[in-house]
Amino acid sequence: MSTQTEQPMVSVEAICESPLGADLSESQCLLLAEASSIIGLDVGAPLLDEGHVDDRLYVVSSGSLEVFKPTGGGDTITLQLLHSGDMAGILGFVDGVPHSAAIRALTQCELIVLDRKDLEKLIEKDPQLVYQVMRTVVRAAHRILGKMNAQFVEMSNYISHQHGRY
């Protein structure tokens, strides 16, 4: 049986070593660690379900996860693999939109979890921290969009047989 376990406190080191801590001071990492939690996932455990809404950002601390969509008849297609340092739930965290795909653990995983309301509580205390975290989130979204654009161009070239590539 697949399970998900939550532990209340994230270490300062885990935040500092994650993408979230890349542009933060140690004291800012401490504030963010206090606002975050960590979860563990067993192999096969779901992290997110397609269509579900949640306001949390997930950062893979260890392990691998699969982002997938059902294709019908019980089959699925893998959209992306997530590894240490990758983020999940970005659009739900920023905008509260339903998840466009599902995510499940391929291996034992640990993930840092940051709830939007917990980050918002830090706006008055340390607005620079919130700004840097959101910059990191936008950078991650930008990388994903860049990959999707490249895949779209490759698929378009394949379909139209242009540029002599296929």
Go through each PLM region and give its residues.
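Cytosolic regulatory regions built on CNB/CRP/Popeye-like sensor folds
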Residues: 1-166
